[in-house]
């Protein structure tokens, strides 16, 4: 099966806007900074529970979730 890679640039911008750093956001999300970095670079994927929590923490509208988490890299 072909691996799908997602573009998290918009997510990274929102994290910086709301939390100032990936470290602060990873702490709020309850994961390590390394784990968040692995997810943001496509080494591992976000779980559904992590996406749900991130949506709340980042105050994303339900309709915008795909823009932040499911935009494929081209």
Model-derived segments and their meaning:
Residues 1-20, 24:
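A short, Lys/Arg-rich alpha-helix, primarily the initiator
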Residues 19, 45-48:
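Residue at a beta-strand N-cap/secondary-structure junction
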Residues 41-42, 52, 70:
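Residue-level detection of the helix-turn-helix DNA-binding "recognition helix"
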Residues 19-38:
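Short alpha-helical DNA-recognition segment
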Residues 13, 38, 67:
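DNA-binding alpha-helical recognition surfaces that contact promoter or target DNA
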